[in-house]
Each structure stands twice: as C-alpha cells, then as structure tokens.
C-alpha cells in the first residue's frame, strides 16, 4: 500500500504481529461492527506508518457528531468499557459520570474494556479544538485494511504533529523512529 506522498506504508498490519495485540484488534473490530467513524492515533498508528512497536492501548479520535457518538457508546457498552482512575482521582470522583451524555459533552476518556485499554481523545489543545479540526485530520487520513474492515489512520504528518503536541517521552521516541523509518530528515 502506498501513502499519498509515495512512500510505502511499511507498518500495515505489522503491529498485529506484536505479542498481546490481538485484544486491541478486537476493540477495533467492535468499533467497525458498530459503524463508529474514528481515526486511529497512538501506537497502532505509529506501527501503520512504519515503526511497529508494542502498545498498551487503542487510541482513537471519534467523529464528533452526535449520531456517531451514540454508535460509539453502543460499542463501549458491548466492550464493557469503564473509566480508569485518572491520577489521584477514582472514576467515581470525576466531574461527569461515564455515560452517553458525558461522551456527547466531549473530553477525553481512558477506558478499560474486556479486550484491553481504549483511549478516546476528543480534545487536544492546538489540534482538536473544533469539529473542523476533526475534518482536517480526516482529510489527511490513510486507510488500513484488516480482515474485519477498514480503519482510518491519522496521516503521517498529522501523527507527527499530534505526537509533538503531546510531548511525552514515548511520543518523542516515536517521532524519531518514524522519521528514521520513513527517511524523513526534518528536524
């Protein structure tokens, strides 16, 4: 499979060969079966773009329209999703209880499911602040085809931008590895 810039997507499905990823792929399959529109970001997207590595979760950005978020909620119910504790807070101490209404209000959720961890990112300062930001990311997304259906993966440059904004140690490692894997000489 080729990317829009002509470079080969070397990571396509390679992430699936990493031990322990079967559960994570099951999360994607359930999202697809529930017709959830989303973009794959995070470690699985890094693998898709040429640097397969182990990851502990599936990271997605869902399309922000209410119908899609209702479909996402149905998938979350099927997955038995429950919020993880955030820092010193237990799930019951969060300002909004985990519900469809809370999902519709936006925000980010770190969830435990029957197949592993799922992180839902609906807001990221500088990248995901409006519905138009999702549309922009979606316009640069590339397909990833699996036996259970097509997943849209955030584009290479957008992934680099999201990783740069997050700025965690793992994100910086991913950026370097992606650039090496894709022979990208940008700083």
Locate the predicted segments by residue:
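Compositionally biased terminal segments of proteins
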Residues: 1-187
């Amino acid at each position: 499979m080729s990317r829009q810039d002509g470079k080969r997507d070397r990571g396509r499905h390679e992430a699936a060969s990493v031990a322990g990823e079967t559960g994570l792929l099951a999360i994607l399959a359930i999202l697809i079966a529930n017709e959830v529109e989303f973009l794959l970001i995070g470690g699985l997207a890094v693998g898709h773009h040429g640097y397969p590595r182990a990851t502990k979760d599936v990271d997605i950005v869902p399309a922000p329209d209410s119908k899609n978020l209702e479909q996402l909620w149905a998938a979350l119910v099927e997955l038995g999703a429950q919020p993880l504790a955030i820092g010193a807070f237990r799930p019951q101490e969060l300002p909004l209880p985990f519900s469809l209404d809370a999902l519709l209000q936006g925000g980010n959720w770190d969830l435990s499911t029957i197949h592993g961890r799922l992180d839902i990112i609906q807001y990221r300062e500088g990248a995901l602040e409006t519905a138009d930001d999702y549309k922009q990311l979606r316009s640069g997304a590339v397909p990833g085809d699996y036996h259970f259906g097509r997943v849209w993966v955030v584009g290479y440059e957008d992934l680099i931008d999201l990783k740069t904004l997050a700025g965690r140690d793992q994100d910086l490692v991913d950026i370097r590895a992606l650039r090496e894997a894709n022979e990208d000489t940008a700083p």
